[in-house]
Amino acid sequence: MTLLALGINHKTAPVSLRERVSFSPDKLDQALDSLLAQPMVQGGVVLSTCNRTELYLSVEEQDNLQEALIRWLCDYHNLNEEDLRKSLYWHQDNDAVSHLMRVASGLDSLVLGEPQILGQVKKAFADSQKGHMKASELERMFQKSFSVAKRVRTETDIGASAVSVAFAACTLARQIFESLSTVTVLLVGAGETIELVARHLREHKVQKMIIANRTRERAQILADEVGAEVIALSDVDERLREADIIISSTASPLPIIGKGMVERALKSRRNQPMLLVDIAVPRDVEPEVGKLANAYLYSVDDLQSIISHNLAQRKAAAVEAETIVAQETSEFMAWLRAQSASETIREYRSQAEQVRDELTAKALAALEQGGDAQAIMQDLAWKLTNRLIHAPTKLLQQAARDGDNERLNILRDSLGLE
C-alpha cells in the first residue's frame, strides 16, 4: 500500500488550467466512483478549490502507476497530458503525508495560514466518506491532518493577522475607492468566501450591499447578518449598473457576467468606473471584460501582490508550524510502519495458533482412546517445539551457509538469543 498526493495549485498552474482541472460539486460523486474504479486505487479523496485540485490516494504499487493516474485525470477532464504534466506535482508516502498536513494547516495556501482551507479539506474528506472511502490508512492520514492543523493554529501565531483572499479583495476595493461608505457593492454567490467578504465590507461601513445567488434562502441568511438586499442571479444583468464594486465567487461552470452585460451597465452609468473582482475558479467574469474602458477586472491571481504585502508577520509563525508538521509526519509514518508490522505479527500468531490447535486436537483424541497420558503429553511437547522452530531454524541455517553474519545476528536478536 502506498499513499499518494498529486495535483496542481496556484503555484504550479495559471487559473486558465486550474479551472479546467477543477471538479464541480455536483459531479464529485461521479468523479470519485470513476477514480475508485481504477484497479490500483484502494481509496481516494478529491480536494478541489479555487486555488488547487488534488487527489489523495491509497494505491497498490504497480508499473506505470504515475502514467495511469495522469491518464485518468486527463481523460476525465479531456486534457492534453503534456499540458498537465508541466504543472502537476506528485508526492508519495512521507511526502504525501507532509503535504496534506501543510495544506490543512494553511502552509501551502495562496494566503499563508488562511483558515478556510481546513474547512475545505474536511468537506472533501466528508464527501469521500459517502461510500467512497475504503482505505483506513488514508482515513487516518486525514484525521491526523485535522489535529495537526488545530495544533498549528493554537500553538503558533499563524492566524494572528486577518489575511485571506476575501480580505485581499476588500483591501483592493479600499485602495481604489477612497471610502467604501459611498459605494454600492454587488456580491455574486453566497458561499464561504463571499460570507467573509460581506463581513469585511460591513466592518468598513459600505453604503449598500446586494447579494445575488442561485439559492435565495442561503443568500437571505447572509443578507440578514450584514444588512444586504437579496436578488436572483437572473437579475444581475438588470442591477449591474447600480454596482460600483462587483465581487463574484460561485461554483458555476460557465461565466455569469459577460462582456455585453458590463458594456450595458457602463453605458447606463455614463462610464463611471466599475471594479470587478473575480475570485471564482472556473471564472465567473469573462476575461474580455478587462479590455473595456472603465471596467477594472481582477482575478484571484491578480490578488497575489496584495496578499504578499500582508505576509511578513506570518512567516516566523510558519517556521514554527513547519517544525510541528515535520514532527507529526514522522510520528504518523512510524504508526504506518507499525501497522505493517502488526499485520505480520497477526499472521505469525495465527499460524502458531493453528499448529497448537491441530496438535492439541490430536493429543486429546489419543487420550480419549485410552493412550498413555505421559507419553502423549511428551509427544505433544516435542512436536509443538519442532513445528514452531522449524521455519526460524531453516533461516538460521541459510544465513550460516551464506556467511551472512549480519542476517544471522538479526535472527538471533529476533529470537531473543544472547
Curated annotation (Swiss-Prot):
Pathway(s) this gene product operates in, as recorded in its UniProt entry: Porphyrin-containing compound metabolism; protoporphyrin-IX biosynthesis; 5-aminolevulinate from L-glutamyl-tRNA(Glu): step 1/2
Family to which this protein belongs: Belongs to the glutamyl-tRNA reductase family.
Gene Ontology biological process terms in this record: protoporphyrinogen IX biosynthetic process from glutamate
Residue numbers binding NADP(+): 189-194
UniProt enzyme class: oxidoreductase
Quaternary assembly: Homodimer.
Identification of the protein by name: Glutamyl-tRNA reductase
Record key words, sorted: NADP, Oxidoreductase, Porphyrin biosynthesis
Record field: catalytic activity: (S)-4-amino-5-oxopentanoate + tRNA(Glu) + NADP(+) = L-glutamyl-tRNA(Glu) + NADPH + H(+)
Record flagged with keyword NADP: yes
A Pfam family this chain is assigned to: Shikimate_DH
Keyword Cell membrane: no
Domain remark text: Possesses an unusual extended V-shaped dimeric structure with each monomer consisting of three distinct domains arranged along a curved 'spinal' alpha-helix. The N-terminal catalytic domain specifically recognizes the glutamate moiety of the substrate. The second domain is the NADPH-binding domain, and the third C-terminal domain is responsible for dimerization.
InterPro entries reported for this sequence: 4pyrrol_synth_GluRdtase, 4pyrrol_synth_GluRdtase_dimer, 4pyrrol_synth_GluRdtase_N, GluRdtase_CS, GluRdtase_dimer_dom_sf, GluRdtase_N_sf, NAD(P)-bd_dom_sf, Shikm_DH/Glu-tRNA_Rdtase
Catalytic residues, chain numbering: 50
Site (Important for activity): 99
Taxonomy, superkingdom: Bacteria
EC number: 1.2.1.70
More info: During catalysis, the active site Cys acts as a nucleophile attacking the alpha-carbonyl group of tRNA-bound glutamate with the formation of a thioester intermediate between enzyme and glutamate, and the concomitant release of tRNA(Glu). The thioester intermediate is finally reduced by direct hydride transfer from NADPH, to form the product GSA.
Protein's job: Catalyzes the NADPH-dependent reduction of glutamyl-tRNA(Glu) to glutamate 1-semialdehyde (GSA).
Species the sequence originates in: Shigella dysenteriae serotype 1 (strain Sd197)
Residues at which substrate binds: 49-52, 109, 114-116, 120
GO MF entries: glutamyl-tRNA reductase activity; NADP binding
